[in-house]
């Protein structure tokens, strides 16, 4: 049977876990086998910029950081379950990638 590999990524952990829990509930209701959500390593993007716009004065810097959290879910590709997953309301800061594997 085919499997669907669902990759979820977001900068907000709460909304990410909320979407993962919705997928988990759909899997339990439809009775398909599921593994996950597996937390993947958090990607940390760091940017250091100079505070002074003209280069004069003391060298002071701002440090900015963006964290991208990811989860991986493997689920059986049952038609009924996949249709319900496609209907989930996804927040703007969450991206979902669904890949069918055999």
Curated annotation (Swiss-Prot):
Please provide the Gene Ontology terms (biological process) for this protein.
translation
Please list where the region (Disordered) is annotated: 33-59
Q: Which UniProt keywords apply?
A: Ribonucleoprotein, Ribosomal protein
Query: Is this entry keyworded Ribosomal protein?
Result: yes
A Gene Ontology cellular component where this protein is annotated is:
small ribosomal subunit
- The record lists its disulfide bonds as none
List the Gene Ontology MF annotations in alphabetical order. structural constituent of ribosome; tRNA binding
The cross-references to InterPro entries, in alphabetical order and at most eight, read: Ribosomal_uS10, Ribosomal_uS10_CS, Ribosomal_uS10_dom, Ribosomal_uS10_dom_sf, Ribosomal_uS10_euk/arc
Q: Kindly give the Pfam families that the UniProt entry links to this protein.
A: Ribosomal_S10
Q: What is the annotated quaternary arrangement, including any partners?
A: Part of the 30S ribosomal subunit.
Similarity section: Belongs to the universal ribosomal protein uS10 family.
Quote the function comment for this protein: Involved in the binding of tRNA to the ribosomes.
Protein name as annotated: Small ribosomal subunit protein uS10
Species of provenance: Pyrococcus furiosus (strain ATCC 43587 / DSM 3638 / JCM 8422 / Vc1)
Gene encoding the protein: rps10
């Amino acid at each position: 049977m085919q499997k669907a590999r669902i990759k979820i990524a977001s900068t907000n952990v709460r909304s990410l876990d909320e979407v993962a829990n919705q997928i988990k509930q759909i899997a339990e209701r439809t009775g398909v086998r599921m593994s996950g959500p597996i937390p993947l390593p958090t990607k940390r993007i760091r940017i250091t910029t100079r505070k002074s716009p003209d280069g004069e004065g003391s060298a002071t810097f701002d440090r900015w950081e963006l964290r991208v959290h990811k989860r991986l879910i493997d689920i059986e590709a049952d038609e009924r379950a996949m249709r319900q997953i496609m209907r989930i309301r996804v927040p703007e800061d969450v991206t979902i990638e669904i890949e069918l594997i055999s």
